[in-house]
Amino acid sequence: MCKSLRYCFSHCLYLAMTRLEEVNREVNMHSSVRYLGYLARFNLLVAICLGLYVRWEKTANSLILVIFILGLFVLGIASILYYYFSMEAASLSLSNLWFGFLLGLLCFLDNSSFKSDVKEETTKYLLLTSIVLRILCALVERLSGYVRHRPTLLTTVEFLELVGFAIASTTMLVERSLSVILLVMALAMLIIDLRMKSFLAIPNLIIFSVLLFFSSLETPQNPIAFACFFICLITDPFLDIYFSGLSVTERWKPFLYRGRICRRLSVVFTGMIELTFFTLSAFKLRDTHLWYFVIPGFSIFGIFWMICHIIFLLTLWGFHTKLNDCHKVYINHRADNNSLDRIMASKGMRHFCLISEQLVFFSLLATAILGAVSWQPTNGIFLSMFLIVLPLESMAHGLFHELGNCLGGTSVGYAIVIPTNFCSPDGQPTLLPPEHVQELNLRSTGMLNAIQRFFAYHMIETYGCDYSTSGLSFDTLHSKLKAFLELRTVDGPRHDTYVLYYSGHTHGSGEWALAGGDILRLDTLLEWWREKNGSFCSRLIIILDSENSTPWVKEVRKINDQYVAVQGAELAKTVDIEEADPPQLGDFTRDWVEYNCNSTNNICWTEKGRTVKAMYGVSKRWSDYTLHLPTGSDVAKHWMLHFPRITYPLVHLANWLCGLNLFWMCKACFRCLKRLKMSWFLPTVLDTGQGFKLVKS
């Protein structure tokens, strides 16, 4: 008896200690990453303090000493608010504002007379170290999965540091200060552009970086400090271009879900910025040195710019009008769990966005041409406004481009559930013992309900949900799948996406086990798909909740000629029954449907110790997939419906330029990069563009 009690006690103690060690390892890793961020912040604080001390020591300016002491006092107050009053938001806001302000002072105070001073050199190395630590911390956080991406345009930290930096620029002359304030606004626009993953965000980043150190931009006296400020702010949105798994509508949620008046005012604000840029461009007419080139060029391209931007503003206004109609439907049908993106698709927003993308491209082209004709390398305000307008128009282009690519795709789904848990020695399904029938029926019914919920939530047309306890014969499955794969929309074209769900017995190599000893291979299914799909560009997404889905996930990656994806699951072979229940078929379906149908879910696919792990694979051409594009007649009808008659001649120019495919080389490179990403760096979460996502653990 004593031995049994001692054994039980020692066993329980061992389990508790093992679990404690695992938790400690996870906590220690998270703490290490957090401390790395603290180290980068502390290193930056030391660099700022040392730099300001050097400037006070060499210039004997008492104002620097007052600001320095006041800064330390404010940071002390922030620490007291954080640790003693638990006012974390107020404390962090105060400290971030002062970090930006003090770093701005370090940038703008003249250091030309003591650049070779040892303390000044130490400050530079500390700033460079801060840059490295900041990049390393952000990268490790994302590789470890500790960052939870949320929809936002600018974070509070970014906004306050930008404001603090802009306030510090007021220590200079008015014209130089205005140039820097506009440059800070341009940096904010660039951060938003990167976070929204706009199509032209990376070129904008390159242009901004190249122009950043022009003397006409009033680049601060300390370029290392300014580079530290710029890189520390740009690191997170730049890395999130790859690491963020948010869908298009999730990324743009702060804008799309904004109030009607705010969105209308944003169009007015955009018009004011564009008009200011045009006015500053007109200052080039004062240059009499090249009047024979400037005056005709500005007259021609200025008129072209005006017409394009009238169309640009009317396009934005029309977009918000259609978005307001979608919001009315969304508010009236919120109880039905209809998301805004599905309502936008039903309202024809995709067609509008695809045409608007071409029109906004003209605005970008006109801005680039006018900027080149009116180039003023000695006017920092002009260059700063140019850097504001570019990402602003790039965001509009990116919004229309991404909404046009992700909205409006029609889809149809078919589910097959064969609840077979026990197999004969030759691998064929057999009838279950009576005591297991009720449990299996409940689990199978749960799978059917889950997949029907999935189809209904994402507005996927349901072809059928077949449930068979005795299995399906090859001929029966053949006829059903062929009928499913040849389905078309009411208007006649094929559906954009076909979703096939299967849960049942499979062989070790992934084939579906059918009644009568037959099997269904992936090659056979793809042969049927090619026969029905023909020259169309539809997609096939196969969802497997079976014990052997890995072979199909690997095999689909070798397909070259079709757009096919396989979402599978891997059940843990050995599980400690004292910590978790053994995984069963249906567990993956439950979690995956909950993940895709509940935006507030707490499911983490990369969590350690999961008994059901997700995996997916896509064909080589998956990233090349695009929906049907509008024709020239579609563009002409849209133009006559939304724009004044005076702009009609641009219809032919629009169709001609779009037919040229000016970005064919960029698109080819972009396509190669996307293929490389999907083959070598497969994302943890892949947005299908239909509202649901494929995931891997």
UniProtKB/Swiss-Prot annotation:
Protein name according to UniProt: Transmembrane protein 168
Residues annotated as transmembrane: 36-56, 63-83, 89-109, 172-192, 199-219, 223-243, 265-285, 293-313, 352-372, 380-400, 646-666
Sites carrying sugar chains: 111, 337, 533, 598
GO biological process: regulation of ubiquitin-dependent protein catabolic process
InterPro entries for the chain: TMEM168
Similarity comment text for this entry: Belongs to the TMEM168 family.
Localization: Nucleus membrane
PANTHER family: TRANSMEMBRANE PROTEIN 168 (PTHR14437:SF2)
Molecular function in Gene Ontology: sodium channel regulator activity
Annotated GO CC locations: nuclear membrane
Membrane topology value: Multi-pass membrane protein
Lineage of origin: Eukaryota, Metazoa, Chordata, Craniata, Vertebrata
Main localization category: nucleus
Record key words, sorted: Glycoprotein, Membrane, Nucleus, Transmembrane, Transmembrane helix
Function: Plays a key role in maintaining the cardiac electrical stability by modulating cell surface expression of SCN5A. May play a role i the modulation of anxiety behavior by regulating GABAergic neuronal system in the nucleus accumbens.
Organism of provenance: Rattus norvegicus (Rat)
